[in-house]
Structures are given as C-alpha cells and as structure tokens.
Amino acid sequence: MADKNFLTEIIDADLAEGQIREIHTRFPPEPNGYLHIGSAKAIYINWSIANQYGGKFNLRLDDTNPAREGEEYVNSIIEDLHWLGADPNGGIFYGSDYFDKCYEYAEKLILEGKAYVDDLTRDEMREYRGSDAGKPSRPSPWRDRTPEENLDLFRRMRAGEFKEGEKTLRAKIDLASPNMNLRDPAIYRIKYAEHHRQGNKWCIYPMYDFAHPIQDAIEGITHSMCSLEFENHRPLYNWVIENIFGTEFPKQREFARLNMTNTVMSKRYLRELVEMGIVDGWDDPRMPTLCGLRRRGYTASSIFTFVREAGISKSDNLIDMRQLEACIRSELDLTAQRRIAVLDPVKLVVDNYPADKTEYFDIANNPNREANDTTTRKVAFTRELWIENEDFAEVPPPKFKRLTVGGEVRLMGGYIVKCESVEKNPDGSIAVIHCTADLETGNGNPADGRKVKGTIHWVSAAHAVDAEVRLYDKLFTEANMNAIPEGSDYKDYLNPDSVVVRKGCKLEEALADAKPSDKFQFVRTGFFTPDSKNPGVYNRVVTLRDSFKPAK
C-alpha cells in the first residue's frame, strides 16, 4: 500500500491542479560527514515519494563549502544510498556543477538592483540586521551602491582582489521583515580554499540559501522536501525562485527531522567522538551513522521500516531507540539462521561417552514457523563440550532450571545429562563439570517418562571456533540528548558499558566460514554478525527480546 501523509496530500493537490506532470525529488547532503539514521528519513521520504508517483529521484552532493568537504564523504554517501536501495534514477549531481550558473544569476540580480556588495564584516552585519526579538535593523552604508559599482566589485571579488570577509554579496530584500532570513541575506562570500572538484577555479562561493533553490530549479525538482529547521528559510527560497526564474516551482516543504533516544545526530559531536578516539571511527557499531549501523548488523530494510513506522509529520518527536531495535529483531527472527555460541565457556565432560567418538545431531536452522525454513544442519557432539558458565550453579537460586550437581538438563538437540561432580580452580571457580549422559535420549524423551525442565546450549570442544564477541549497547545514558542542561558536556553522558568485549568465546564450527554480511541468532543469546573489519570478531546486532512494543 502506498504511503499517505501530509506531503503526498500536497503533491496530490498539485497534480490535480495540472501544475506538474512528473514528480521530481532530490536528496542534497553536504559531503562533510557520514550519513546517519536521521539522513535515512530524508532519503526515504524523497526516494519513496518519487517511486510512489513514478517520478525521478536525484542525489545532489551539496559541495558549496570547499573548506569542509571531500571525496571520502562523497564516496560514503553514494555507497550508503546504494546500500539502502535508494539509487537515484534521476542521476547524481554536484552543487559545484552549477557554480557558473549561480554566478550568472548573481550578476542578474545585481543588474536588476536586487543584490549589492557590502563591506560590513560578519559581526557588523549581524549587528546591523537587528534581531527577531524586536531589535530593528539598519541599512548598510553600502546598500545603495549602483548596479554598475556592485557589478564591478563582484567581478573583482571573483578575480581575487579582496581578502576573506572584506566583501560580501547580499540580496536586497526587506530589512523590516520579521523573518531574519529576508533581512538582506548574504548570498556570496569570499573563500580561499581548494575545492575537491573545482580546484582553485573559484575564490567566491554561493551561500546555501542562494544556491539550493537554483540547483533545484535547474534539475527540474518539483518538490524540495527538507527538515523543519528550514521552514523559516522558505520565503527566501521562494524569493530566489521568483526573482531568477519567475515560476512557482520548485516548492519547498518541510517535515520533522528524526530524533532518536540515547544518541546524538550532530555532525560536530559525531566528528569529535571519532577524532578523540572515543569511538572506533565513523563506522563504529555504536554510532548512529548508516555505515555504523551496517557494521553493527542492521539491514537497509529494517532502517526503512523504522523510518516508515516512526511516521512523517510536522511535529518534532523523540523516537525510542528500542523501536529501531524491534524492527531489526522482527526481521532477523524470520531471516537469521540459528547457530550455537558459548560466550562464557566452562568445560563439561560426558564421562560415559567414548573419548574417540564423534556423532552429529540434526538441528534446525530456523525453528520459527513463520520463516518456513525446514532445513537442518549437523552439529558435532563429543565427550568434551563447552557450556555457558551461567548455565551451571553449584548452589542454585530458587526456580533455577539449568544444570546443578545431581540435576539433569537437556543438551539442546542432543542428550539428557546429569551432573555427577565438579573440579575447581584454586580460586574456587568451576574448572570442569563432570556428567553422565542418558544415551537413550539422543532422539527423544527418556524411556521412563521423567520430565527434564531445563535445556541448555553447548559446543563440541574439539570442533569449536574461537572468537571474540562484542556486546553493544546504547552510546549515551541520557535518553533525550537534546535536552541536557545548558552548559553541560554531552560527553559526560557517555555510557561506560556501551560495549562489553568477550574474548575466548566458543562457536560451533558452521560459523568458521561466516561472512560480514551474514546474520545469525546465537541461540538463547541474541542476534550477531561477523565484524567487517576484524576477522574472528562478532558484533551483537540486538538482544533476543525486549519489553518494548512498537505502536501498531
């Protein structure tokens, strides 16, 4: 079923009025950082709407600020869109493709008396513009320069005759407007920095609010959909479109950005976490970046499901991270094959089982009925096994249903065993658990009909694969990182237990050839994926269960 929301209602009305025939959208990230889960919402909205209406979707790299952008980010953005399945059928473009056109249109505004070169510094300009709290604006002493003088100065700006900040091109709009964005905004500034695509061809660069509507219009974008913080920029967007192109389209429309609990979305904060070594790069599995989520084991489909379930509205809200976890958990419960992994191993010896014998039990790859997976795999069983430390208790607590001295449990898919005795290390910890097996129970229940309540998982010691397992959790302890007290340091809220590393884990041998793209449920433990950077390391995608119930 097609998604319906306030944006599609706007589009339906525009189509009904015959103003447009084909929907054309775009996603215009600045290549100065890696995309994150919030970016996925903007991608989904623009891509899905174009897809829903049989239109076109562009990717435009908004590389109008040469000081902060680079090919590393360009490549990562393109890779992320491809991974999400949101390939731009309208094409891939760069903001810098339109520098010549932006310059041409700036000269047009100058000649029409709608733009002027200002000598005020940035601080002086801020002072002269006043404030939206009632402080009136004042015209710059250079506001009434003639078009001829402004054109000469602007061309000299381009020729590199002035220092950074010495001259600025401003649009001449309305100094009395209550909207600060219309009080003669800067539309070109001097910047001496090598551009990643244009080199040193330019030393003046268009401001975002000027370049963006021009880029949209040139590409034939019909609906420029962006997050809510640009709502009060819309009158400036419209001014540029009307005064340069004389049309009503493109139309800018805004939606609420995606905010999620226990994380930060600010590129500045994310960059600090990387540069300070607090996380292991932009793709650290604790990061909200798409590459981090991908390395963690999230799928593109689970991310788009999350975005869709979070909804599209004009009201800011905070989405519980557990809703994202619920999306991937539901998906992997159906798609992930089951494997056995012992994360905190202790040796179990079946004393009445031959030391030189190996047999194989058929164990289901995915017992979830909805998965419709009837396949099995063979799991080796030998005299010496590994089980979880927590599955044995010498002095069991109340309602403990796992292994105890004198007690019985079912080894998952295998025999019922009874603990006869234990060996201990010098520090008192358990070294070896000695058991006997009821060798008649390999394919069913005991002949005498006795009930065994507990079932535990295990791995053959002779066939086990050694691995490191990383148990990831939320990066910050505070749910709403946008509401921390003013003046406090966001790093004070870092979760010291955001990752717990388990070394010496024992995995079943079927995992020896696992690839980073593979996803598994480690039975009774959680969902895991091989790390893409470190062979022999597994990342926990998400726990097996949570009390969170997503809204229907």
Kindly give the residue locations of the regions a language model identified.
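Secondary-structure transition/capping motifs at alpha-helix termini
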Residues: A16-Q19, S48-K56, H82-N89, A217, ...
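Substrate/cofactor-recognition hotspot
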Residues: F306-K552
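Active-site cores that bind ATP or allylic diphosphates and position pyrophosphate for catalysis
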Residues: D63-N65, E71, K108-L270, I328, ...
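Conserved short loop/turn motifs at secondary-structure junctions
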Residues: P28-N32, R60-R68, G91-D100, D123-E124, ...
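A glycine-rich helix N-cap at a beta->alpha junction
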Residues: Y73-D100, Y105-A106, G113-Y116
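Long, charged, mostly alpha-helical binding arms that flank functional sites
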Residues: P250-C327
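N-terminal catalytic cores of NTP/NDP-binding nucleotidyl/phosphoryl-transfer enzymes
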Residues: D3-D12, A16-E79, E194-S227
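Intrinsically disordered or highly flexible coil/loop and linker segments, enriched in small
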Residues: I20, A115, K163, M180, ...
